[in-house]
Amino acid sequence: MPVRASIEPLTWENAFFGVNSAIVRITSEAPLLTPDALAPWSRVQAKIAASNTGELDALQQLGFSLVEGEVDLALPVNNASDSGAVVAQETDIPALRQLASAAFAQSRFRAPWYAPDASSRFYAQWIENAVRGTFDHQCLILRAASGDIRGYVSLRELNATDARIGLLAGRGAGAELMQTALNWAYARGKTTLRVATQMGNTAALKRYIQSGANVESTAYWLYR
């Protein structure tokens, strides 16, 4: 099947990674997607519903490769027990950057599609931005008795009813971090908490489902 799609430059990613990349937005009103239209870009991304095998086949015929599967989940917000989390401060940024850099080294921004350190740098910047209230609105942390950070979660308000988890990590602290996220959403009057993770991250999927989440959708990321 032919693919109709617009091509949009990824301005922020291009500046951050130093690449010339774009993303295709598939829509029936757009022109046909052709190799000539894709040629000016060194990297082109596409995100499609995992159930849409027609688009998957068509994009692969245009030279796209499957990079990652994504699962989006949602759970109802309730007032969970207090986890003892506190709001991260700017003094926590160096430690958080180091933790996020190590925890998210194998995302869709990995080699060979991007530089070997690209994924680590991207998520280190993400968590710093969350502390500063840029993109994600806040970062909450759990501290060990020593004062070291043992877990963190970033969160963003989407609209009047929904909030979304950005990054969540902390060995053995998953249940507490989910309580933290639910309390944050509850305090802001939200009814739904959303979170996405890689299809292959079974530990995260189990944690979210154990916390009451249901799968809402699945998607594939493809690159050319």
Swiss-Prot record:
Keywords attached to this entry: Acyltransferase, Transferase
Pathway membership, UniProt: Bacterial outer membrane biogenesis; enterobacterial common antigen biosynthesis
PROSITE patterns on file: GNAT
Listed Pfam families: Acetyltransf_1
EC number, as in UniProt: 2.3.1.210
CDD domains, sorted: NAT_SF (cd04301)
GO biological process: enterobacterial common antigen biosynthetic process
Subunit structure: Homodimer.
PANTHER family: AMINOALKYLPHOSPHONATE N-ACETYLTRANSFERASE-RELATED (PTHR43877:SF2), AMINOALKYLPHOSPHONATE N-ACETYLTRANSFERASE-RELATED-RELATED (PTHR43877)
Family: Belongs to the WecD family.
UniProt-recorded name of the protein: dTDP-fucosamine acetyltransferase
